[in-house]
């Protein structure tokens, strides 16, 4: 018996490296490494099979400028079967609360170490941004939140769960963002590209101010970026912003970065990438006489598209975005086919299904002919994904001046023309109307996560969704049927928010944290 190995050694594990949890939360270098983990956690919203959340957030679900075919988060897109037990809504909640939990650990650890250390202070500020940003994203979707700013320990596992007031939530968001703004730098070295800067934090702070109708604050934050954010400027052409695999250009404030290098593709397998490109790319390769081709976007699922209402907002003769940001026509590309090189007629499928999936015009913003150039049938992409860019900052500042000073505001007109004139349109001299600004938001920023919160913030989400969401056969004669269930099922006062995930209600107790009233 004495010769048998003891369990004692197994009960006293020894780390084979210096990187332990204690190291990560108790040293400046450890906190700096821990913050990098927040970037990875944030990017997971777009990774691989879990990327539905990013598609829903960015591709204008339940708005007036998108038509949905099938597949990705169908219950959210159509609203006819959306319930509190929806898995995507659960994932959205847990994703952001996971970020909040990790940020809480970093923030408290940094404060315990002392913020006099520059490395510690920077880690603290970045964690503050991520926490404030996560709460803001959650509030826009759910409104009813549990507010927590402390790390979870064995001493506080039992908690008093109760919904925080809107005032409490916004005070927390604003406080976190203000702390980040006060600490973060305008410029970062090239090796740190992709990390949060003062400009990113100010952009989000301006968004928060717009919700509060604090237009003076929104204007200040935006114009600080225009004046002091010297590493940012508008690209000469709109299409230049999205051209290439690495979207490292002067207009991008923040992007999720992807790489085909080992470890550059996110969680899961080392080369997971994301699927936004194939979800928004027409399934052209399924047409007889066609094959996978990088120049047409590679692999396409054909699930989410711009609709006819959006296309109708462009001056097709003058506005360069109409041609440069979309693919409107497809061509037979199999050299063995007799029709090789000819345009595929849009009415190929007549009254039968096929057009929406295989021939519908598509957005090129997430189109990827770069990372899949040698493997166009690959079902993932490694093209960077933009989160915020300067064009939104300018239009947000335009809107703020409009609300404060009216449609003849010289500043509102100046900022409106930053995107409008760049696209080849004759300069607009005003006066502006709210509809003009909303239309320019759509033309410039479709499929960039702007439309849904914009319409909700202005109290227009229900009206716009009921009037224009999806497409009817009468609006697009090539369709086989209507694709506009959101119009029929959007209930005013209910679908402007998501239900609290049922699992979370069960965990916290309905008596402590009840379901939102419209979803009871």
Say what each PLM segment does.
Residues 1-3:
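Conserved small/polar residues in nucleotide/adenosyl-binding loops
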Residues 7-10, 67, 96-99, 172-174, ...:
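Long, intrinsically disordered, low-complexity segments
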Residues 8-69, 178-181, 198-346:
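An aromatic- and glycine-enriched ligand-binding surface/loop that stacks and positions planar moieties
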Residues 32-46, 68-142, 164-168, 177-189, ...:
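Conserved, well-structured interaction surfaces
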Residues 215, 407-409:
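TPR-repeat structural position
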Residues 309-389:
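Flexible, polar/acidic helix-loop-strand segments at domain edges
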């Amino acid at each position: 018996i004495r010769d048998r190995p003891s369990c004692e050694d197994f009960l006293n594990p020894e780390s084979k490296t210096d990187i332990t949890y204690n190291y990560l939360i108790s040293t400046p270098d450890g906190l700096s490494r821990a913050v990098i983990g927040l970037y990875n956690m944030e990017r997971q919203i777009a990774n691989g099979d879990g990327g539905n959340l990013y598609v829903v957030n960015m591709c204008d679900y339940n708005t007036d400028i998108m038509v949905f075919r099938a597949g990705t988060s169908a219950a959210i897109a159509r609203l006819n079967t959306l319930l509190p037990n929806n898995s995507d809504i659960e994932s959205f909640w847990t994703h952001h609360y996971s970020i909040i939990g990790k940020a809480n650990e970093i923030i408290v650890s940094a404060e315990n170490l002392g913020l006099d250390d520059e490395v510690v202070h920077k880690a603290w500020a970045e964690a503050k941004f991520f926490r404030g940003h996560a709460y803001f994203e959650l509030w826009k979707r759910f409104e009813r939140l549990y507010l927590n700013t402390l790390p979870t320990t064995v001493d506080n596992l039992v908690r008093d769960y109760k919904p925080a007031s809107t005032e409490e939530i916004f005070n927390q968001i604003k406080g976190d963002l203000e702390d980040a703004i006060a600490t973060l730098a305008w410029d970062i070295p090239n090796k740190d590209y992709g990390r949060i800067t003062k400009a990113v934090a100010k952009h989000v702070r301006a968004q928060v101010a717009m919700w509060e109708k604090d237009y003076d604050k929104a204007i200040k934050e935006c114009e600080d970026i225009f004046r002091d954010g010297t590493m940012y400027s508008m690209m000469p052409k709109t299409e230049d912003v999205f051209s290439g695999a690495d979207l490292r250009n002067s207009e991008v404030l923040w992007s999720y970065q992807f790489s085909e290098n080992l470890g550059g593709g996110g969680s899961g397998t080392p080369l997971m990438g994301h699927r936004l490109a194939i979800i928004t790319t027409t399934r052209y390769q399924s047409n007889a006489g066609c094959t996978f081709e990088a120049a047409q976007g590679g692999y396409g699922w054909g699930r989410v598209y711009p609709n006819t209402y959006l296309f109708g907002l462009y001056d097709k003769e003058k506005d360069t975005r109409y041609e440069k940001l979309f693919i409107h026509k497809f061509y037979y590309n199999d050299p063995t086919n007799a029709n090789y090189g000819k345009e595929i007629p849009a009415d190929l499928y007549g009254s039968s299904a096929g057009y929406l999936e295989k021939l519908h015009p598509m957005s090129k913003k997430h189109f990827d002919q770069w990372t899949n150039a040698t493997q166009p049938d690959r079902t993932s992409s490694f093209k960077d994904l933009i989160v915020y860019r300067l064009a939104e900052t300018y239009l947000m500042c335009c809107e703020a001046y409009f609300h404060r000073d009216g449609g003849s505001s010289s500043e509102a007109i100046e900022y409106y023309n930053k995107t409008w004139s760049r696209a080849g349109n004759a300069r607009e001299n005003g006066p502006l109307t709210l509809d003009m600004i909303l239309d320019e938001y759509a033309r410039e920023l479709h499929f960039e996560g702007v439309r849904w919160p914009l319409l909700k913030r202005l109290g227009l989400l229900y009206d716009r969704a009921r009037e224009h969401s999806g497409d009817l056969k009468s609006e697009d004669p090539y369709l086989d049927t209507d694709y506009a269930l959101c119009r029929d099922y959007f209930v005013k006062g209910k679908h402007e928010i998501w239900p609290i995930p049922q699992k979370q209600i069960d965990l916290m107790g309905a008596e402590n944290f009840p379901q939102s009233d419209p979803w009871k």
